[in-house]
UniProtKB/Swiss-Prot annotation:
The active site is at residues 59, 134, 166. NCBIfam families: PRK13286.1 (NF009802). The gene is amiE. This is Aliphatic amidase. Keywords: Hydrolase. It comes from the Bacteria. HAMAP family: Aliphatic_amidase. It is an enzyme of class 3 (hydrolase). InterPro entries: Aliph_Amidase/BUP, Aliphatic_amidase, C-N_Hydrolase, C-N_Hydrolase_sf. GO terms for molecular function: amidase activity. Its EC number is 3.5.1.4. It comes from Rhodococcus erythropolis (strain PR4 / NBRC 100887).
Amino acid sequence: MRHGDISSSNDTVGVAVVNYKMPRLHDRAGVLENARKIADMMIGMKTGLPGMDLVVFPEYSTQGIMYNEEEMYATAATIPGDETAIFSAACREADTWGIFSITGEQHEDHPNKPPYNTLILIDNKGEIVQKYRKILPWCPIEGWYPGDTTYVSEGPKGLKISLIICDDGNYPEIWRDCAMKGAELIVRCQGYMYPAKDQQVMMSKAMAWANNCYVAVANAAGFDGVYSYFGHSAIIGFDGRTLGETGEEEYGIQYAQLSVSAIRDARENDQSQNHIFKLLHRGYSGVHAAGDGDKGVADCPFEFYKLWVTDAQKAQERVEAITRDTVGVADCRVGNLPVEKTIEV
């Protein structure tokens, strides 16, 4: 893991993250113009960072937040589509992989159901190699239709990459899912605003440490007339230490080199802090000393997760018993979310 140079090598993946200014757009013409602006920025960045293998743009950077529902549906894109064609051409020209936001992607039942909040990973040949739909939209504000799974794809120089989006990153389960699928770099694209800056910076660092993985965060910056976005895009080592972090500046960039061999060596040879190994080999020192084998205990000790898998409805009821049983809150209503208990059919 190295920071401060503009290069990369056969063993290091040069990763850049961007504090893209949150755009305020209203139609597809504006979206496509902004997509071309992102493409031009990517190509320019390659001149300044010749070692750049991967560039990451934030959530909402392509379309902005459509606060008008009609505009949200009217600007929802297809994948592949006009937006991705612009990004693919830029990846080919810059000979660089890119991660881009599509908010939203048309639902299969468009326009009868809300769009998805989607990220795409495009390789340096212009091919889409991963499409991830946000599993945990930022309720109660975001009205995206939720996705249902994470992915791992082989990225530049063989580094294994997973994508997550913004509020996803507040749930340790999604990081663990990516790591246990083999992700070595988890990319968190976000359009996060104040007041939650300190919490979000802390969360990404903690999850890098807890999952023995690299983390790249690209966040929006600026003010779009509604929210103030705090930037602080960052690249974090698999030991939880920040390699490089922007401030709040619009279009700020950070860059670091992520060693492929270093993370694989750490996962194979680290012991006391090898969290993903130890989770499935619980107490192996004591188990071995007892003569009960040399693999520790693999069984899941967490009753809630067992319940969630075997009876999701009962798990939901348990959560409601310690929180609330309606999605809306009577003292602070958001939209038309119900604040009185309804019967599910």
